[in-house]
Amino acid sequence: MQQQKQLLRVLIAENHQDLSDIMSQLIDTEPDMRCVGQVADASDVLAAARRTEADALILDLMLQGGSGLPLIGELAGALPALRIVVFSGLAFSEDVAREAKRRGAAAFVTKGTDFSVLLNALRQGSRAA
């Protein structure tokens, strides 16, 4: 009997609902991924990651209720297996990307980049890969 490959469970933390919905739909078209939830408020991210048992998180730095940057360390400490991919529309800054990675983000992808770059960042090193 052939073993079924586990789907990569992706949570989206994005304050723009239209973009979040589009990302969710695109993720769900991938054969190895499934969107397990969407949140817009910084205060909901950790609980949603736990509840959905997400393998990977797409994290916008500008969320309702606060910045996503401080969340990175909290998430990395509480859920060390969670792959955090920052997806930000802020003008790319080496300093911001470096700080995000220092706090525990696995990757930093700028909004406007081809979606395949984000998908590849989610896949790299994930526990479901």
Predicted features along the sequence, with ranges:
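Alpha4 helix (beta4-alpha4-beta5 surface) of REC/receiver domains from two-component response regulators
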Residues: 70, 91-109, 113
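Acidic catalytic/metal-coordinating carboxylates
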Residues: 41, 67-70
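Hydrophobic/aromatic residues positioned on beta-strands within the core alpha/beta folds
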Residues: 87-88
